[in-house]
Every structure is written in C-alpha cells, then in structure tokens.
C-alpha cells in the first residue's frame, strides 16, 4: 500500500533532493509536491512536476515532510497542522522547531524528526559521484539520526523507512531524542569536526 506524502518546499534545496529520492519509490509513496516560490516551481518543472495546492495536499496526507527554512516552520505549521487528518505524521528535518516548541502539537498526530549526519570525511567511496557528494542524499552513503517525538511506537517503523528513503543511501539510522539531536546538531557535531580538521 502506498502512503500519501505531502512534501512542503518540494522545489527548494533540500526539497529537490527529497523529490529525487522519493521518485525512486513510486510503489511506496504517492507524493504531492507543494511549492510556492518561483524558483522552486521552476526546479519542479525541470523535473516534469506540477506543484499540488497546499490545501489539497494536506487533506490527503498520511505524512507531511517539512523541507522548509527553519525560520518559516512555525508560521507554516500553524497553518497546515489543523488541516491534517488524525493519525498523520509530521516529519521535521531539523530538531530546532520541535525542541523549541514552535510547531503546534496535536495529540492525534505523530511527530517524527530526522536529520542527516552527512557522509564521513574519511570514507570508502570509490565512484566520483559519491566522492563529490559532500552533503549526502545523492550518492554517498551516510548515517542519519531520528526521533519519534510524539506518537505510537509502531509509527517508528513508518518514520524510519521514510527517513531512509529521503536521505538515501543510508548506512544506519540511529534513534535519539529530539533533545539529544538538538545538542548534537549543530553545536557538538560542527564544533568537534572543525576542531579535528
């Protein structure tokens, strides 16, 4: 059975990476690509995709991925969360909004937060494409971290599969809390990595 996924910010930097990865799994996902910016719409058009109106996408969504700039998440989620059907999953790509409490929380929704760890600086990638993929999500294998912030335990598996697909290729998905993720990214990860380099 395919899951109906609404991808908010589908034509942006992160949105395009997710768009490209979700299109590899038409058997798993029926994706509504939501985009309002002129450049984002052009990026989707280059992929042969026409954006879906936000209200239409929200009404049908089993999961909503927030591929949005952090500064917009609070405002946009206050608009879309009331439109979601009970049992839907809100997927954040960064812990900041969930940890700071800027997203409205509904008891009947699942909130899943996931973040890439990015490819290791020292790795075993051999293809030129993978070696040039410093961010991950295109060709280089990397780890991710995820948290089931709110929702039934059985939703972990749904979130895990979605996270692995949007960030593919993934080596491991390490389960953490939103608080742990907020501490690790960016403070610990970037400070530690910069010191080592």
Model region roles, listed by residue range:
Residues 11:
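Conserved glycine-rich cofactor-binding loop
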Residues 94-184:
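Rossmann-fold dinucleotide-binding core
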Residues 25-47:
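NAD(P)-binding Rossmann-fold cofactor-contacting core
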Residues 48-61:
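Short acidic low-complexity segments
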Residues 28, 84-88, 107-109:
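A short helix->loop->beta-strand "cap" motif at the edges of active sites that frequently abuts
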């Amino acid at each position: 059975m395919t899951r109906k996924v609404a991808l908010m910010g589908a034509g942006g930097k992160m949105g395009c990476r997710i768009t490209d990865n979700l299109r590899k799994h038409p058997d798993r996902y029926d994706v509504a690509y939501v985009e309002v910016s002129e450049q984002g719409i052009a990026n989707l058009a280059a992929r042969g995709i026409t954006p879906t109106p936000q209200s239409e996408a929200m009404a049908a969504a089993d999961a909503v991925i927030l591929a949005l700039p952090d500064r917009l998440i609070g405002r946009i989620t206050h608009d879309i969360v009331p439109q979601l059907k009970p049992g839907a999953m809100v997927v954040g790509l960064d812990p900041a909004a969930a940890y700071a409490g800027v997203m409205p929380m509904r008891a009947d929704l699942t909130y899943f937060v996931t973040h890439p760890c990015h490819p290791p600086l020292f790795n075993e990638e051999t293809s030129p494409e993978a070696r040039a993929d410093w961010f991950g999500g295109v060709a280089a294998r990397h780890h991710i971290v995820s948290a089931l912030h709110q929702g039934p335990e059985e939703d972990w598996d749904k979130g895990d599969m979605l996270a692995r697909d949007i960030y593919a290729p993934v080596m491991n998905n390490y389960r953490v809390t939103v608080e742990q993720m907020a501490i690790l990214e960016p403070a610990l990860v970037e400070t530690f990595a910069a010191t080592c380099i």
